[in-house]
Every structure is written in structure tokens, then in C-alpha cells.
UniProtKB/Swiss-Prot annotation:
InterPro entries membership: 5-3_exonuclease_C_sf, Flap_endonuc, Flap_endonuc_arc, HhH2, PIN-like_dom_sf, XPG-I_dom, XPG/Rad2, XPG_CS
Co-factor binding comment: Binds 2 magnesium ions per subunit. They probably participate in the reaction catalyzed by the enzyme. May bind an additional third magnesium ion after substrate binding.
Organism: Nanoarchaeum equitans (strain Kin4-M)
Protein name, per record: Flap endonuclease 1
One of the record's GO molecular function terms: 5'-flap endonuclease activity
Subunit structure: Interacts with PCNA. PCNA stimulates the nuclease activity without altering cleavage specificity.
Top-level class of the enzyme under EC nomenclature: hydrolase
EC number(s) from the headed UniProt entry: 3.1.-.-
PROSITE patterns cross-referenced by the UniProt entry: XPG_1
Lineage: Archaea, Nanobdellota, Candidatus Nanoarchaeia, Nanoarchaeales, Nanoarchaeaceae
Length: 339
């Protein structure tokens, strides 16, 4: 679901061109990207399927979009979620009680063409199956694209890699990685570069958006710890929002209290201190990415033989993939030798 910090980050977000990300390493929240691919392939929001009725949208999106990123000179690392913290499971269980209501909202969002809303409800309903995740990992391996299995939250791991300088940005549509301390987040890199306006036959250009944590904190004159408390008042993946509090009110409350722990205590947020501490110190691991050579036969087996993808189209895409990866690996080699 992600935390809704849109109003808080909007004053400082910057629209950029894809070419400005040339040579940059981006740690992409894999689950977030797979949800995007799952629902953004077709305009009706319904997933693509093979001849056996199995969903293939996640593979199509992952394959072609990753190649597009590589052609822009972007070096992606996909970060997969591990074991969720126990308070996230509790939050999921509570939300499942409203499953019928969520299912209705999900279908309504699809009908209206509001894919972002549909994705939000799909996440709560658990529309991403484990076999899709495993297929995605196999495809990335075949493509020569690095991925890391996070011990817990993918966005926490992506934030850690960005803080360490392994990656230049976290790539996600959500804002959670800011709470985990990522210095920079880039949005709109795993979605189509043209988006249909809900209910209209009009397409608008979608550009990457960069949000810097320091800019957010400086604009509102708050600390990262206070930003976490604000997010908790607004509702996160781990706790329900406090009724009647919007973004501006949340900022005022946290500034008035000063100490974020006092805010959590005053509003009696369930597991509040534990959640707060988790945002500050989540489980993470070290990772050194390597971009390899594509295994053409294996890609063909996964996409064409197993899932009925068009062989000519896949063949052409593999050529693009090989060319883009060669270029990236050559540049990495040159920079290693200081050329």
C-alpha cells in the first residue's frame, strides 16, 4: 500500500528527463515494479495471459521495461521483499476483514481506468502470487540483471544500498524508502512513458520524478524521525491512520510535540515504538551487483516455449538487451581502469 506522503513531497519533487539518469544505478523495489507491470500492460487493467490462461503481464513488463531502462544507460538492481515484520502481518489480517469492500473498490478502479488506485487495492488483496515472483527472478537471472533478496522489506534494503552508495537512487512509486532513510528516490521509471487519463481518451507524458530526503526535511523544517511520526499518523503498511488527521495537521502535531515518541504515545498507535524503531533500523544485507551476459536460450525457453511470447519479438528484444548490456559493461570496465 505504501504511505501517502504525496502532499508532503510535492513541494520539492523535481521532474527530470530519462537521459539525466544515464550511468546511474537504481535499486528498484521489485514488488512495486511487478505490481505496476501486472496492471499497466493493458488499458483495461486486466493482465496478459498465455494459451494456458497463466498470467504473463509481470514477465512482459519486466522484460521489455528493463531493456528500455538499459537503453537509457540506467543500471537496474531489483530488490525483492523478504520476511515481513510481524506488525505488517497483523495489519494485513485487519485489512483482509474488509476484503469484499476492497475487491469492490479494486474492480471500480479498474473500470474507471485508475490503475494506481487498482494497484493500491491489489496489494492489500495479495494479487501478486509467489510463483510470479519466482518467475521474475529466473527471468532476471537469464537476462544478466542483478537482484537481491532482502531479509525483510525491499524498500528498506533499497534505501540501505542507496545510503551506502551502491546505488544512486531507490526506484519506487511509493515513498516508504524515504522513511527508511534513502537520500534519493526516483519515481515513474517502471511505468509507461505515456499514461491515459482516467475516463478520457487522452494520453499525457510521464517523466521521472526525483525526491531528495534532505530537501523534504529542510522544506518542512523537520527531522527524519519526525517524518516517520508524520507518516505513522497518516497510516503506513504497519498501522492504520489516525482518523481525522491529514498531512498538514500531522506536520503541525509533530512540530508541536517535538519528540516523535511522544506523538506515538499520545495517539496510542498500536506497536508504535516497534514500528518507529523498524523504520530507523530495519534488517538489511550488503550486496555488490554485477551485470552479466544474457542467456539467450534460457530467455527464449522462459518466454517463448513456456509462455507463448512472440518469438520474433523476443529475438529482437534479446539483441537490444545484448547491445545495451555490452555498452554498460564496457563503460564499467573503462571507469575501473580510469579511462
Amino acid at each position: 500500500m505504501g504511505v501517502n506522503l504525496k502532499e508532503i513531497v510535492d513541494p520539492v519533487k523535481k521532474e527530470i528527463e530519462f537521459k539525466q539518469l544515464f550511468g546511474k544505478v537504481i535499486a528498484i523495489d521489485a514488488f512495486n515494479a511487478l505490481y505496476q507491470f501486472l496492471f499497466s500492460i493493458r488499458q483495461d487493467g486486466e493482465p496478459l495471459r498465455d494459451s494456458k490462461g497463466r498470467i504473463t503481464s509481470h514477465l512482459s513488463g519486466l522484460f521489455y521495461r528493463t531493456i528500455n531502462l538499459l537503453e537509457y544507460g540506467i543500471k537496474p538492481i531489483y530488490v525483492f521483499d523478504g520476511t515481513p515484520p510481524k506488525f505488517k502481518i497483523v495489519a494485513w489480517e485487519k485489512r483482509k476483514k474488509h476484503k469484499e469492500q476492497l475487491e469492490s473498490k479494486y474492480k471500480e478502479a479498474l473500470k474507471k481506468g485508475n490503475i494506481q488506485e487498482a494497484i493500491k487495492y491489489a496489494k492489500s488483496l495479495g494479487k501478486l502470487d509467489s510463483y510470479m515472483v519466482e518467475e521474475a527472478k529466473k527471468l532476471l537471472e537469464a537476462m544478466g540483471i542483478p537482484y537481491v533478496q532482502a531479509p525483510s522489506e525491499g524498500e528498506a534494503e533499497a534505501a540501505y544500498l542507496t545510503k551506502k552508495g551502491v546505488s544512486d537512487y531507490c526506484g519506487s512509486q511509493d515513498y516508504d524508502s524515504l522513511l527508511f532513510g534513502s537520500p534519493r528516490v526516483v519515481r515513474n521509471i517502471t511505468i509507461s512513458e505515456k499514461r491515459k487519463l482516467p475516463g478520457k481518451n487522452i494520453y499525457v507524458e510521464v517523466k521521472p520524478e526525483v525526491i531528495e530526503l534532505e530537501a523534504v526535511l529542510n522544506y518542512w523544517k523537520i527531522t527524519r524521525e519526525q517524518l516517520i511520526a508524520i507518516a505513522m499518523l497518516l497510516g503506513t503498511d504497519y498501522n492504520e491512520k489516525v482518523p481525522g488527521i491529514g498531512p498538514k495537521t500531522a506536520i503541525e502535531i509533530v512540530k508541536r510535540f517535538g519528540d516523535p515518541i511522544k506523538v506515538i504515545e499520545y495517539y496510542k498507535i498500536p506497536n508504535g515504538k516497534e514500528i518507529f524503531e523498524f523504520f530507523l533500523n530495519p534488517p538489511v544485507i550488503d550486496f555488490e551487483p554485477k551485470w552479466g551476459k544474457p542467456n539467450k536460450e534460457l530467455i527464449f525457453k522462459i518466454l517463448v516455449e513456456e509462455h507463448d511470447f512472440n518469438p520474433e519479438r523476443v529475438e529482437r528484444a534479446i539483441e537490444r538487451l545484448e547491445k545495451a548490456l555490452n555498452k554498460i559493461n564496457q563503460k564499467t570496465l573503462f571507469s575501473f581502469f580510469g579511462s
